[in-house]
């Protein structure tokens, strides 16, 4: 009976030269996090007993990202078979199943991996299970040659006959391998090919020569996309977003124009939420039930509680906490601030490093002046307070509960609860001044003429 133990080897040492980037290929983000993290999250759902990530030299950033999973270094990039061999010391003589995956193939699903493991642990006891797929454009993919006895061979496109090239079943590179046979197979792979590399695909022929069976499982092209260029990264992003949008709608959210709403991998959206077109969610956003988010909003690192109305053109930055039933309107930016239940900041305001108390109203053009060039300071607006339009609150400062601040004020001192504070120059009126001024200017102009 096949073992239920599982080890995973993730190959992530590729240079990614086609990306034309100083960032390692597997670190390029999809939905707000590195593509390799998507893969590790999927694999973690299988509860593997061991996992090791194969990286290249000078890839410390990848090592930090995949931690606590261990990494091994492939000092010389001599092919996929050579990369797998680098994991031998970390895995040792593992007697379970070994999945070999690729850090630049981040969209593979847990369901597909479970099907591969079920095949590996099935009655045929195959030494190797290869994940195949049928792309719309088979191009120069290697082909899987399948017969009644299972997978007969993996043929590289350049070595394939015309008939084999007509075969639509292609090789994804993903494999499930019997751990008891893995190292015996890998150590016999040679580099007698045009590239002088050690190909993992050669283990199929070696296993069959040993009298073992090899089989395949077929996956979907969309989940087997390999990201090697920026154009493929864009395709992968679109596929990830399609999944996230579908999940949000399945969980009870309404997306007026789904294609224009962009989620992050960890966005949490409640039920009966309505999201209008052109909304972007950065990482770390939680939205409660019955929230309406109008168009052209950008949220990141924030909490939005039930019944909030936001937008259009609202920006919520990290640390923003918007309380139940609050209104955050057009061209309002909130950063590292708590807006309590029922408060309203309806237009043209900046609220940073602050608290806006329950039921308070912040008028158009109000800003919290939270930075003096060296330090950030806090603004505390009490419950039920009313801040008139075009007010500057110079932190640190406190406006008490129920207080009213007159429009155009520059508040630098504490306003006591229930008080009226007006801090602006007194209005002055000079009767007849405008008429005299116009006459003077007309006379000057006539004299010049």
UniProtKB/Swiss-Prot annotation:
Chain intervals for the UniProt region annotation (Linker): 231-251
Function recorded in the entry: Catalyzes the last two sequential reactions in the de novo biosynthetic pathway for UDP-N-acetylglucosamine (UDP-GlcNAc). The C-terminal domain catalyzes the transfer of acetyl group from acetyl coenzyme A to glucosamine-1-phosphate (GlcN-1-P) to produce N-acetylglucosamine-1-phosphate (GlcNAc-1-P), which is converted into UDP-GlcNAc by the transfer of uridine 5-monophosphate (from uridine 5-triphosphate), a reaction catalyzed by the N-terminal domain.
Protein known as: Bifunctional protein GlmU
Region annotation (Pyrophosphorylase) ranges: 1-230
Keyword Magnesium: yes
PROSITE patterns in alphabetical order: HEXAPEP_TRANSFERASES
This enzyme's EC code(s): 2.7.7.23, 2.3.1.157
Keywords, sorted A to Z: Acyltransferase, Cell shape, Cell wall biogenesis/degradation, Cytoplasm, Magnesium, Metal-binding, Multifunctional enzyme, Nucleotidyltransferase, Peptidoglycan synthesis, Repeat, Transferase
Sequence positions that bind Mg(2+): 104, 228
CDD domains according to UniProt: GT2_GlmU_N_bac, LbH_GlmU_C
UniProt pathway annotation: Nucleotide-sugar biosynthesis; UDP-N-acetyl-alpha-D-glucosamine biosynthesis; N-acetyl-alpha-D-glucosamine 1-phosphate from alpha-D-glucosamine 6-phosphate (route II): step 2/2; Nucleotide-sugar biosynthesis; UDP-N-acetyl-alpha-D-glucosamine biosynthesis; UDP-N-acetyl-alpha-D-glucosamine from N-acetyl-alpha-D-glucosamine 1-phosphate: step 1/1; Bacterial outer membrane biogenesis; LPS lipid A biosynthesis
Gene3D superfamilies cross-referenced by the UniProt entry: Hexapeptide repeat proteins, Spore Coat Polysaccharide Biosynthesis Protein SpsA, Chain A
Record: residues binding UDP-N-acetyl-alpha-D-glucosamine: 11-14, 25, 74, 79-80, 102-104, 142, 156, 171, 228, 317, 335, 350, 361
Enzyme class (EC, first level): transferase
Chief subcellular location: cytoplasm
Active site: 347 (proton acceptor)
Single annotated GO MF: glucosamine-1-phosphate N-acetyltransferase activity
Chain positions recorded as acetyl-CoA binding sites: 364, 370-371, 389, 407, 424
Subcellular location: Cytoplasm
Oligomer and partners: Homotrimer.
Cellular component terms per the entry's GO annotation: cytoplasm; membrane
Protein's GO biological process: cell morphogenesis; cell wall organization; lipid A biosynthetic process; peptidoglycan biosynthetic process; regulation of cell shape; UDP-N-acetylglucosamine biosynthetic process
Catalytic activity line of the entry: alpha-D-glucosamine 1-phosphate + acetyl-CoA = N-acetyl-alpha-D-glucosamine 1-phosphate + CoA + H(+); N-acetyl-alpha-D-glucosamine 1-phosphate + UTP + H(+) = UDP-N-acetyl-alpha-D-glucosamine + diphosphate
Cofactor: Mg(2+)
Start and end residues of each stretch annotated as N-acetyltransferase: 252-449
Co-factor remark: Binds 1 Mg(2+) ion per subunit.
């Amino acid at each position: 009976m096949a073992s239920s133990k599982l080890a995973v080897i993730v190959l992530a040492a590729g240079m990614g030269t086609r990306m034309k980037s100083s960032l390692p290929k597997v670190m390029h983000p999809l939905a707000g996090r590195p593509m390799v993290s998507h893969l590790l999250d999927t694999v973690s759902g299988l509860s593997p007993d061991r996992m090791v990530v194969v990286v290249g030299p000078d890839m410390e950033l990848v090592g930090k990202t995949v931690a606590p999973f261990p990494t091994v270094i492939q000092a010389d990039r001599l092919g996929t078979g050579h990369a797998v061999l680098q994991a031998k010391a970390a895995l040792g003589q593992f007697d379970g199943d070994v999945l070999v995956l690729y850090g630049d193939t981040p969209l593979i699903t847990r369901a597909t991996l479970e099907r591969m493991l079920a095949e590996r642990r099935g009655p045929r006891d195959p030494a190797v299970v290869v994940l195949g797929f049928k792309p719309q454009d088979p191009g120069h993919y290697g082909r899987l040659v399948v017969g009644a006895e299972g997978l007969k061979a993996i043929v590289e496109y350049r070595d394939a006959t015309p008939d084999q090239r007509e075969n639509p079943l292609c090789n994804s590179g993903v494999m499930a391998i019997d751990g008891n046979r893995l190292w015996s197979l890998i150590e016999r792979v040679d580099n007698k090919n045009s590239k002088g590399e050690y190909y993992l695909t050669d283990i199929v022929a070696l296993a069959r020569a040993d009298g073992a069976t090899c089989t395949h499982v077929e996956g979907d092209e969309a989940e087997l996309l390999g990201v090697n260029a920026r154009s493929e990264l864009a395709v992968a992003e679109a596929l990830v977003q399609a999944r996230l949008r579908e999940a949000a709608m399945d969980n009870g959210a309404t997306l007026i124009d789904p294609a224009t709403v962009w989620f992050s991998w960890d966005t949490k959206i409640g039920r009966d939420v309505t999201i209008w077109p052109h909304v972007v969610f950065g990482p770390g956003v939680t939205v409660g039930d019955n929230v309406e988010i109008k168009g052209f909003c950008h949220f990141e690192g924030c909490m939005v509680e039930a019944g909030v109305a936001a937008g259009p053109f609202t920006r919520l930055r990290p640390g923003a906490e918007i309380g139940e039933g609050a209104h955050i309107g057009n061209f309002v930016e909130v950063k590292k601030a708590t807006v309590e239940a029922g408060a309203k900041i309806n237009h043209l305001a900046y609220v940073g490093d602050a608290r806006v108390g329950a039921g308070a109203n912040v008028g158009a053009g109000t800003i919290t002046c939270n930075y003096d060039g060296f330090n950030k300071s806090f603004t505390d607006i009490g419950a039920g307070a009313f801040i008139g339009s075009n007010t500057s609150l110079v932190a640190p400062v406190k406006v008490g509960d129920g207080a009213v601040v007159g429009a155009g004020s520059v508040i630098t001192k504490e306003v006591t609860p229930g008080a009226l504070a007006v801090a602006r120059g007194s209005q002055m009126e000079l009767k007849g001044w405008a008429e005299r001024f116009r006459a003077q200017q007309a006379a000057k102009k006539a004299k010049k003429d």
